[in-house]
Amino acid sequence: MDKRNKANVVLSLCSMFASRGNCIPIPIVFNIYMRAFPKLVGRGTSTYARRRRARSILRCERCYRVYPPLPFSKKCDNRTCVPGISYNIKVADFIKWGVTEVIPHPGFNF
């Protein structure tokens, strides 16, 4: 769908809510808008692709720490871990989105 059709959907939703009352619930309009259009398939964002890329550089796909963890680190269990305050952005981008320009070497630029 092009941008004009998406804009028409938003305007029609807002006008429908405005005709039924004084307020327009923006979160509900946004939720309907996000569910109205199909998600783009592919682009390497699947969970399987994230796990495969994380395993290729020996990192956890959730918190981007070294996995399997070192003997003295206890923060990553690969089940309930979350990223820390300052994690490596290059590693996170590679795990989330993959590589488009260069092929990284494990342990070289990470």
From Swiss-Prot:
Suppressor of viral-induced RNA silencing. The potential mechanism of action is based on sequestering siRNAs. Pfam families: Carla_C4. It comes from the Viruses. It comes from Helenium virus S (HelVS). InterPro entries: Carla-bd. Keywords: DNA-binding, Host-virus interaction, Inhibition of host innate immune response by virus, Metal-binding, Suppressor of RNA silencing, Viral immunoevasion, Zinc, Zinc-finger. GO terms for biological process: regulation of DNA-templated transcription; symbiont-mediated suppression of host innate immune response. Belongs to the carlaviruses nucleic acid-binding protein family. A zinc finger (C4-type) spans 60-81. Residues 50-53 are annotated as: Basic. This is RNA silencing suppressor. GO terms for molecular function: DNA binding; zinc ion binding.
